[in-house]
From Swiss-Prot:
HAMAP family: Arg_tRNA_synth (MF_00123)
Pfam families tied to this protein: Arg_tRNA_synt_N, DALR_1, tRNA-synt_1d
Keyword S-adenosyl-L-methionine: no
Protein name: Arginine--tRNA ligase
Encoding gene (name): argS
GO cellular component: cytoplasm
Family per similarity comment: Belongs to the class-I aminoacyl-tRNA synthetase family.
UniProt-listed GO biological process terms: arginyl-tRNA aminoacylation
Keyword Lyase attributed: no
Subcellular location: Cytoplasm
Amino acid sequence: MNIFADFDARIKKTFQDIDLKPKDGGELDLSRIGVEPPRDASHGDIATNAAMVLSKAVGQNPRELAARIAEALKADEDVESVDVAGPGFINLRLKASYWQRELLVMLNEGTDFGRSRLGAGKKVNVEYVSANPTGPMHVGHCRGAVVGDVLANLLKFAGYDVVKEYYINDAGAQIDVLARSVMLRYREALGESIGEIPAGLYPGDYLVRVGQELAGEFGTKLLEMPEAEALAIVKDRTIDAMMAMIRADLDALNVHHDVFYSERKLHVDHARAIRNAINDLTLKGHVYKGKLPPPKGRLPEDWEDREQTLFRSTEVGDDIDRPLMKSDGSFTYFAGDVTYFKDKYDRGFNEMIYVLGADHGGYVKRLEAVARAVSDGKAKLTVLLCQLVKLFRNGEPVRMSKRAGEFITLRDVVDEVGRDPVRFMMLYRKNDAPLDFDFAKVTEQSKDNPVFYVQYASARCHSVFRQAADQLGLVDLDRVAMGSHFEKLTDESEIALVRKLAEYPRLIESAAIHQEPHRLAFYLYDLASSFHSQWNRGAENPDLRFIKVNDPDLSLARLGLVQVVSDVLTSGLTIIGADAPTEMR
């Protein structure tokens, strides 16, 4: 249960109890009322700005109104005390019995604690990675892969119907270049000397194997075919090989998509899908024949002052109208974007999320314009931009050679430090802030390494369970037994840990609403810190140890608390896509 939603309802009920009404009649606007943890934990358990938000509407001084609301809240059986602070903040401190009951709810829900129905009935498409199938994934793809994957997991946990999607850019000019590059490697595999790879082709050694496989399958037959026919075969085989490599890289990172959508699908049957999408926009009045003003600055060599088929995107929020067709009659890449969005919308998605690199910032307004035009404003579109990742080793930048074909791959990073450190650390900054990734720091065993610190807390929980087996003979811990004596948890440090656990449902919902999966990583670090602190208190004070051999009921209660910590760590790490270890190796 979200305790803040619970007390939001209780606080609003007091408005009826004190007959709180707007001075000018009508209904109170309660939308700006916030109920949240106080910024300073010493101020209490729950804080609200209700009096300050409502004072003008009811015609009363904020502090006086706060005092009225506070007096009504004192009648709540779960409230220990209520204070008015500053200009009219109301701070509530709750009784230990309330936290003990909440802990029992958490224990009974297990790893489902925090699961929400926030997104019930809402279908969301999260598109991420969508790297061009022209080579292995490099480290630059890594952040978007993790952000998109964890966001999708988070939304699922919050009750949304989520589809993870990868858009395969397999219809552009870069694929033609790729096919010619592989054709060269195919000839090389047949024994021909190809010399230096010509400028403009893909030079990577990863294409050598594709050429060898083609030589093994076709022998010299491709050389005997018309070039266009041979290149079509090479293109198909190469895309399959590149996507197999990309899927393997993603699998190593524990990233798994539900749908792989080929751009070529939009172009079948003479691009019928694109033509239909443009026809729909035309019927809505969003397409016209016209000329675009010349671009600012020096004109490109291929600039043509000509009449074009244009999307009237400035009327739906874009900076300029966008061409839908090229001078040769083929469709622009943007026309494909329009069609792909329409396809998603026709599949029943209420919301589409695009996770893109920061270099795609110029796409945001045009995609938002497409969403408004195609769905008549009914669908929500969000673009999350991921800033660059800078690689370091022991504080020194990792130098990547600019020589063509050499770069650090995603697989290089995962193989060196492991999947979990990569996933966790890619979330340890908000996606729109640059991120430094130090190979040494993410593998050190210290508090300064967030993923180690969180996973170590999980392992410590299980070490407590093993101690319970050794010292109390409790091999199979029973949740009913553990929850039967929570009234014994009265130490302030124990209650503080319960408070931190109680924040989890609110954290899940707020991270889902704001589409900020990094909040989960921060919360898990804070929870781990609280648990480690409680462990250390037990090391310093025998009365606070989790296992008290001479007090089995208290031991069971504390084991129940540890179990809930373990459940929440497991839940959060699962959403992140990392393991919750039972011991550290």
